[in-house]
From Swiss-Prot:
PANTHER family: CHORISMATE SYNTHASE (PTHR21085:SF0). Keywords: Amino-acid biosynthesis, Aromatic amino acid biosynthesis, FAD, Flavoprotein, FMN, Lyase, NADP. This is Chorismate synthase. The lineage of its organism: Bacteria, Bacillati, Bacillota, Clostridia, Eubacteriales. Pfam families: Chorismate_synt.
């Protein structure tokens, strides 16, 4: 039986269709939505170094079709849409009148082309391309941007930075140091060290010249999550499992690490985050567990590294098979970015924001925003009195 959740959403739309759309159910009423903030998150997703030609066409703006009265949530399902500027150029291709010899039958290794062709049997890889495309992340960013605003009102923030491009690494810094984070957010590649940024740019430029793409790592931190979110009572209620499930759904993500989880050099006495008690609160001098123990938030920042593979659409020829005649051939190129790591950092912030708000509402069920604020404020003020 599927687990009931207070907050849920579905999205729909094709990469070159008329619009990307989402229905969000469970957002509390009487919350004033900052639409400019959502549009700014969409802009942050687009203005990244390493992007392809599509981002010169699209000027993403969110439109609310239901669930708001003015800018105030009503408690009804919220329908959001981002209309695709590129859609008119693809009307004939997506019309269903494509001739047999115009159908795409050469799958790109690493993409959903081959699996989609056989799973759905439409005879045209274009159908899987349209839905597996990372264009879908535009509407997921908008959904998360709404959740981010609600979280900020209850003292929770999600931030990110690019930690690596290929085998080049940036410094790990406190994302909640406002001066440092402003520098990161103004960086072309959302990194802190200026010399590292130059190296990142050079690496991406070399890949572009060689017809290649490149992956990397994103570091995420969530501040303000109270102790007790998630549960170890059942396997499917653990907070790290839920976050992993959501994060792994992002196109290109192949691994996730919480805290220092992949540092195999540490022994138990060093890895375990010691427990201290100061000024009426429990504190940890380290955060190797990444803010989650036994599937439950422990009050520290939730910290994750997310590993993103190179984009599968490359100009460099590699082997594949033409599904029309089953003969070996080389890959075809579909317009794409050189690196998705920088935009992924923005998308991941918003994916995490949705998941954290979902678990907040599961723990503090609230139909109305001020009810939620009261519930969580009371909990924060009394939890350590137990």
């Amino acid at each position: 039986m599927e687990r009931y959740t207070m907050l849920r959403f579905l999205d729909a739309g094709e990469s070159h269709g008329k619009a990307m759309m989402s229905i969000i159910d469970g957002i509390p009423s009487n919350f004033k939505v900052d639409i400019d903030f959502i549009n700014n998150e969409l802009k942050r997703r687009q203005k990244c170094y390493g992007r392809g030609g599509r981002m010169k066409i699209e000027k993403d703006k969110i439109q609310f079709l239901s669930g708001l009265r003015g800018t105030m949530t009503t408690g009804n399902p919220i329908t959001m849409a981002i209309y695709n500027n590129d859609s008119p150029n693809w009307e004939k291709i997506l019309s269903g009148e494509v001739k047999k010899d115009e159908k795409i039958t050469i799958p790109r290794p690493g993409h959903g082309d081959l699996v989609g062709y056989f799973k759905y049997g439409t005879g045209d890889i274009r159908d899987s391309i349209e839905r597996t495309s990372a264009r879908e992340t535009s509407i997921r960013t908008a959904v998360g941007a709404l959740c981010k605003q609600i979280l900020k009102g209850i003292g929770i923030e999600v931030r990110s930075k690019v930690y690596s491009i290929g085998n080049l690494f940036d410094e790990k810094v406190d994302l909640f140091d406002q001066c440092k984070y402003k520098k990161i957010d103004n960086s072309l590649l959302r990194c802190y060290n200026e010399e590292v940024e130059k190296s990142f740019v050079k690496k991406i430029d070399i890949c572009r010249e060689q017809g290649e793409t490149i992956g990397g790592t994103v570091f995420l931190s969530v501040r303000g999550v109270p102790i007790g979110l998630g549960s170890y009572s059942q396997w499917d209620r653990k907070l790290d499992a839920l976050l992993s499930y959501a994060i792994m759904s992002l196109q290109g993500v192949k691994a996730i690490e919480f805290g220092n989880g992949m540092n195999l050099n540490l022994r138990g006495s060093t890895f375990n985050d010691e427990i201290l008690y100061e000024k009426g609160k429990f504190k940890r001098p380290t955060n190797n567990c990444g803010g989650i123990e036994s599937g439950v938030s422990n009050g520290e920042n939730i910290e994750m590294k997310v590993y993103i593979k190179p984009i599968p659409s490359i100009k460099k020829n590699i082997r594949t098979v033409n599904l029309r005649n089953r003969k070996e051939t080389t890959t075809r190129y579909e317009r794409s970015d050189v690196s998705a790591v920088v935009p992924a950092s923005i998308v991941l912030e918003n994916i995490v924001a949705f998941e954290i708000l979902k678990e907040i509402l599961n723990k503090f069920p609230s139909d109305e925003y001020y009810e939620l604020k009261r519930n969580i404020s009371h909990y924060r003020g009394t939890i350590y009195l137990r």
